[in-house]
Amino acid sequence: LGLGALAAELRADVDYVKAVGTLAKIYEQDGTELLHGDFYPGSWLRHLASDSFWVIDPEFCFMGPAEFDVGILVAHLVLGGKSLIRALEVFDLYSSLPQFEPELALRFAGVEIMRRVIGVAQLPLESDINKKSELIACSKKLILSSNHVF
């Protein structure tokens, strides 16, 4: 089972395709938060001498839902081998936004995982097909589950 077969399975999953389409519509709507738009580790810099942190490459910025950038962050924690439990720590940072929806952020994370494993923006992940299959299963769970339990 290769990446092509994994992609074909997702394309054949009507519920998955519909859910991703719904997320695309949310992504395309005007939102209230200024987003980075590509908030993954390749856009983060840490200057060790001053212990400062910078986010670079603002050319993708747009107004949208905060859950989008947070979902990208959570996806890259998962792609980096971290547990989804780390998402709870991230969500705590957004608890002051009353409209923030952790479930939506997790769904966006699911799309980003899929995009980085089998999409046009694949990461050079050092993992075998079994690990990539697990990541795709995680993507499906995040996108299709209505109530995520950690």
PLM segments and residue spans:
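Catalytic activation segment of kinase domains across protein kinase-like and atypical kinase folds
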Residues: G42-L73
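Charged, long alpha-helical assembly modules
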Residues: E28-G31, F60-F62, L77
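Short amphipathic alpha-helical segments and their helix-coil junctions
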Residues: D51-D57, L88-E101, H148
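Active-site activation/catalytic loop segments of kinase-like enzymes and analogous catalytic loops
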Residues: A66-L97, G110-S127
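All-alpha amphipathic helical-bundle segments outside canonical DNA-binding/catalytic cores
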Residues: Q99-A109
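Hydrophobic HxD+1 residue recognition
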Residues: F39
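An alpha-helical support segment within catalytic cores of ATP-dependent transferases
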Residues: L1-H36
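Regulatory N- and C-terminal appendages and interdomain linkers associated
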Residues: A8-A12, Q122-F150
